[in-house]
Amino acid sequence: MTDAASLADRVREGDLRLHELEAHADADTAAEARRLLVESQSGASLDAVGNYGFPAEAAESAIENMVGSIQVPMGVAGPVSVDGGSVAGEKYLPLATTEGALLASVNRGCSVINSAGGATARVLKSGMTRAPVFRVADVAEAEALVSWTRDNFAALKEAAEETTNHGELLDVTPYVVGNSVYLRFRYDTKDAMGMNMATIATEAVCGVVEAETAASLVALSGNLCSDKKPAAINAVEGRGRSVTADVRIPREVVEERLHTTPEAVAELNTRKNLVGSAKAASLGFNAHVANVVAAMFLATGQDEAQVVEGANAITTAEVQDGDLYVSVSIASLEVGTVGGGTKLPTQSEGLDILGVSGGGDPAGSNADALAECIAVGSLAGELSLLSALASRHLSSAHAELGR
């Protein structure tokens, strides 16, 4: 077996390219060779990056040109009682973050939720989207394509589902802009986040569209999907899981545990999360849902770039018979429990903490459960931060924790 130093020398000499090393050595040796190259060129020490706790081959489907692994501290909040459509009972929530005080805040929210009897969560809509863009001659041809698509949905569905053992084409929504036609296909991808599944299936469908109509495919993705970008269509129509969590907290719990009142939290939420967000033209009508989404995404192997869509959340707060009702509705939470980063050993353990690693029974139930847990974690984070702001304790809490 070729050693790392020899491989590094061959790259320097132009005999090998950086991405070809795994063909000449095991994945760990290839990663070591790349570290040697980077260290020699940059003067940096990659000792910590190279000190990772799983075989490099376990990451081969998740990364190219691997040199090692970063390590983000992971903690747990809870346990928190969850009454979900796909999850029930007390759950510890795994969060990986470098933001001090985040875990403490979410943990406080979980404790208060438990004092109120737990949170309720439900996935209300599910579907991964891909929206190719076609070129047509004019608006008359665009109308013809839209009509053809509606009349031939069964044929499109058959073509899509021939590419997958698990996915299902749910519907297609056309959008026309001049001589551009966007067809937004929505799929049930079960326990997979499903972007790859949706892309492969949509490619097959596009072949049928081009063969049977005058339309020409310009791009498999026309940005109406819309993936990894702030987009109102995701906030309104949803993408991935649309999930809501809520809790009703007795007045005495709010006053004794959160040191504020239901009225103060409700007013703050309206003026900050609703009016303030509207004035800022924000798509996120919440305090910091992205914090919890990002931390749980990292801990469970989700696509971290899709935190963009996960921040499409609305937090509501109102007084109900003297108690405080709080909800968080996340419109486009793109999660999976199979495929992608969920296969990495550390991230798989994060899913194990929640009891949702791998495919669920029935299919899709594990990803639904993960979405519900993230929604409850977000609810805990919102409740804690809003209360800290209402009681004017935010800065003192950070100071006490040395953050």
UniProtKB/Swiss-Prot annotation:
Which family is annotated? Belongs to the HMG-CoA reductase family.
Keyword hit for Cell inner membrane? no
Give the first-level EC class, as a single word.
Answer: oxidoreductase
Query: What induces this one?
Result: Up-regulated during growth at high salinity.
**In terms of pH, how does activity behave?**
Optimum pH is 7.3 for the reductive deacylation of HMG-CoA (in the presence of 3 M KCl).
Check the record and name the CDD domains matching this protein. HMG-CoA_reductase_classI
GO MF: hydroxymethylglutaryl-CoA reductase (NADPH) activity
Q: Which reaction does it catalyse?
A: (R)-mevalonate + 2 NADP(+) + CoA = (3S)-3-hydroxy-3-methylglutaryl-CoA + 2 NADPH + 2 H(+)
This protein's superkingdom? Archaea
Q: Where is the signal peptide?
A: none
NCBIfam families linked = HMG_CoA_R_NADP
- Protein name per its UniProtKB record: 3-hydroxy-3-methylglutaryl-coenzyme A reductase
Q: What does this protein do?
A: Catalyzes the NADPH-dependent reductive deacylation of (S)-3-hydroxy-3-methylglutaryl-CoA (HMG-CoA) to (R)-mevalonate. Functions in the mevalonate (MVA) pathway leading to isopentenyl diphosphate (IPP), a key precursor for the biosynthesis of isoprenoid compounds such as archaeal membrane lipids. Is also able to catalyze the reduction of mevaldehyde to mevalonate and the oxidative acylation of mevaldehyde to HMG-CoA.
In Pfam terms, one family for this protein is: HMG-CoA_red
UniProt pathway: Metabolic intermediate biosynthesis; (R)-mevalonate biosynthesis; (R)-mevalonate from acetyl-CoA: step 3/3
Q: How is its activity regulated?
A: Is competitively inhibited by (R)-HMG-CoA and lovastatin (formerly called mevinolin).
**Organism (species):** Haloferax volcanii (strain ATCC 29605 / DSM 3757 / JCM 8879 / NBRC 14742 / NCIMB 2012 / VKM B-1768 / DS2) (Halobacterium volcanii)
Swiss-Prot/TrEMBL keywords: Isoprene biosynthesis, Lipid biosynthesis, Lipid metabolism, NADP, Oxidoreductase
Lineage of this protein's species? Answer: Archaea, Methanobacteriati, Methanobacteriota, Stenosarchaea group, Halobacteria
Q: Which residues form the active site?
A: E99 (charge relay system), D303 (charge relay system), H398 (proton donor)
Give the GO biological process terms: coenzyme A metabolic process; isoprenoid biosynthetic process; sterol biosynthetic process
Recorded hits in InterPro entries, A to Z, give: HMG_CoA_Rdtase, HMG_CoA_Rdtase_cat_sf, HMG_CoA_Rdtase_CS, HMG_CoA_Rdtase_eu_arc, HMG_CoA_Rdtase_NAD(P)-bd_sf, HMG_CoA_Rdtase_sub-bd_dom_sf
Q: What is its EC number?
A: 1.1.1.34
